[in-house]
Amino acid sequence: MSKFVFVTGGVVSSIGKGIVAASLGRLLKSRGYSVSILKLDPYLNVDPGTMSPFQHGEVFVTEDGAETDLDLGHYERFTDTAMTRLNSVTTGSIYQAVINKERRGSYNGGTVQVIPHITGEIRERIHRVAANSNADIIITEIGGTVGDIESLPFLEAIREFKNDVNRNDVAYIHVTLLPYIKTSGEIKTKPTQHSVKELRSIGIQPDLLVCRSDKSINEALKKKLSGFCGVSINSVIEALDADSIYSVPLSLKKEGLCKETLNYLELEDKKCDLKNWEQLIHNLRNPGGPIKVALVGKYIELGDAYLSVVEALRHACIEQKALLDLHWVSAEMIEKNSAETYLNEVDAIVVPGGFGNRGVNGKIAAIKFARENKIPFLGLCLGMQCAVIEWARNVAHLPDASSSELDPNTPNPVIHLLPEQQDVVDLGGTMRLGVYPCRLTKNTTGKNLYDEDVIYERHRHRYEFNNYYKQSFLDSGYKISGTSPDGRLVELIELENHPYFLACQYHPEFLSRPGKPHPLFKGLIKASQDKLTQSN
């Protein structure tokens, strides 16, 4: 029988509920409990798959092909547990399900209302995660801020939820902000008091308060919050701003978050084993020399658009005892100037995924610069497609080569639409999504990095390498180091006589974990270190 923890947020948005939920998951797992975490998002989109990265940040793809909120990436990285499409719920998906049931006559002609039908569907989704995962503890993060009209059905649903189970099977955690007023030199508790009052008004009494602050909270403040908010003083948890998100589990452990949560759930506070995590933080805080990595993208104004890529680079640098010196490079600025202007001093170049024409020629120019100047390079999804186009134009004597996505009239579509995508009209959830196998070719860098015959990687694309051009690429020096098991889809390519030049059709960043960096990212950083050592 699963226990349930609900994480809400107050005072301001983007307060770090996802990191708190993920950190609690890490702490529970370190005590031997199995955990699954789901996100309830209050927007009307069915999923974030068609949302602009500027609006939402990256789309995180699960093993079963769901396009989800980036917080699921945090959940997976912190707990090292794969989530599924059940772990991502939006208002849009809830309403869609309820309306479909109404159309099928599932409500027997009754009036369909927010209460009980919408809230009932939300509760059902939470129970479904528990049944599917069979986890000891289900952590649910409610998106938005207490007081937002969009979040009300979700808050009502988690209020009702305590009637579905025993009271000791549920714990409510409220993440809030304690602002520091410089002019008075005081930390203010009033916003938190009002946020808790708002929660109470809809029938939820938080069991724990996680208080974000950039100043330490003394016992007097904790006592004040305890009295006004109706929680035990031991359940007022200080959450100071951290130097890294990966240090948050350690600080919350010190504050007793996990111990107090287990106390409310009437579960044993087992011995906590965080030795590997502590070593990770030690390595993070004591790096070796810097590695200058250029991330050449089109959404660089919002770093969250490439969140998993950045974290994968960070994991690799921690493992290799290097300091990540990340350079955000606009592909459009390369088009306006030159690749050399922005990339001349970097040690490695990464070209991540994306869609559409904007900035593509800048990405292609960056790849050419990496190839010609022997700079370690890694291309992801569209990054691989751009690498194919660059080689076709500049080496394989196909100067007018392109992708049929970028130029439908190109005479040499070295990248073309997947056959199964030919008749697809809808955009949402219709790409090649989720985990697919890839067979690696012997005597290649890719095979050596993975040390496996068959790997499983997550995908999100509509276009692929055009096999009509495969032989001409092989003849001109390209190596295909990974394909689908039937050999039809090219998944991984590389170049010989280069320190490190690999590009993949899949998204390896989604499988990178702190303490277990992805082989392609680890290989990139190691190659950069080796090249620096040789040059010195």
From Swiss-Prot:
GO terms in the biological process aspect are: 'de novo' CTP biosynthetic process; pyrimidine nucleobase biosynthetic process
GO-annotated molecular function? ATP binding; CTP synthase activity; glutaminase activity; identical protein binding; metal ion binding
Q: Which family does it belong to?
A: Belongs to the CTP synthase family.
* UniProt protein name: CTP synthase
What pathway, per the record?
Pyrimidine metabolism; CTP biosynthesis via de novo pathway; CTP from UDP: step 2/2
The subunit structure is: Homotetramer.
Keywords from the UniProt entry: ATP-binding, Glutamine amidotransferase, Ligase, Magnesium, Metal-binding, Nucleotide-binding, Pyrimidine biosynthesis
What Gene Ontology terms describe where this protein resides (cellular component)? cytosol
Q: Which organism is it from?
A: Prochlorococcus marinus (strain MIT 9301)
Per the record, the domain of life is: Bacteria
Species lineage, top-down?
Bacteria, Bacillati, Cyanobacteriota, Cyanophyceae, Synechococcales
| Coiled-coil segments | none
Sum up the protein's function in the record's words.
Catalyzes the ATP-dependent amination of UTP to CTP with either L-glutamine or ammonia as the source of nitrogen. Regulates intracellular CTP levels through interactions with the four ribonucleotide triphosphates.
